[in-house]
Amino acid sequence: MDSKVSNGSSLQDERITNLLVFGFLQSCPHASFHKELEVLGHELPVHTSGSDELQTDGNRCSYFMEDAAETDSESQEAVIRDIARHLARIGDRMEYGIRPGLVDSLAAQFRNQSLSEEDRRQGLAAVLQQLVHSYPADMGQEKTLLVLTMLLARKVAEHSPALLRDVFHTTVNFINQNLLTYLRNLVQSEMD
């Protein structure tokens, strides 16, 4: 675990969150937004290897190091996909507690083009605060918030598939601002 102090999420953190939310949404086999999700998948930044990086001695990175880095990255991506599938199954069980009126209201906020990204995050946070208290505390508040955040994204995308891109990015930003430490620890504990 990297212990350096940071005031925000790094590209690596954003990549992890993108993979997690994308994997969560992919785990919904009967969703009406699969076409939009496929398009979004092509727009997401992909991990690039350091195959053309020069080393301090002026030589190119060796294949052994490149293969190890790619293997680590692939391993991490597999872990994140597994976590996403697991959280999606939990979300399936939690779905009962989300009233359609909350989803309608949240979808209306995402359709409102005059709202800023911050306004959308605040709207998402307000809905989450309404929901989080209606679930048992045995799962832990951070895990409950993470699942509910992604579940709300899925519900809004099912309600209005055209909103998928906006709700995806707001969800990623919300997680990076509010649940990043929990997410880092979750991924790290699964990697160990």
UniProtKB/Swiss-Prot annotation:
GO cellular component terms listed in the entry, alphabetical order: cytosol; mitochondrial outer membrane; mitochondrion
GO terms classed as biological process: apoptotic mitochondrial changes; hepatocyte apoptotic process; positive regulation of extrinsic apoptotic signaling pathway; positive regulation of intrinsic apoptotic signaling pathway; positive regulation of release of cytochrome c from mitochondria
Main localization category: cytoplasm
BH3 (motif): residue ranges: 83-97
Keywords: Acetylation, Apoptosis, Cytoplasm, Membrane, Mitochondrion, Mitochondrion outer membrane, Phosphoprotein, Ubl conjugation
Subcellular location: Cytoplasm; Mitochondrion membrane; Mitochondrion outer membrane
Matches recorded under SUPFAM superfamilies: Bcl-2 inhibitors of programmed cell death (SSF56854)
Residue list for modification Phosphoserine: S75
Any Pfam family: BID
InterPro entries in UniProt: Bcl-2-like_sf, BID
Comment field on protein domains: Intact BH3 motif is required by BIK, BID, BAK, BAD and BAX for their pro-apoptotic activity and for their interaction with anti-apoptotic members of the Bcl-2 family.
Subunit structure: Forms heterodimers either with the pro-apoptotic protein BAX or the anti-apoptotic protein BCL2. Interacts with PLEKHN1.
Role description: Induces caspases and apoptosis. Counters the protective effect of BCL2.
Annotated protein name in UniProt: BH3-interacting domain death agonist
Source species: Sus scrofa (Pig)
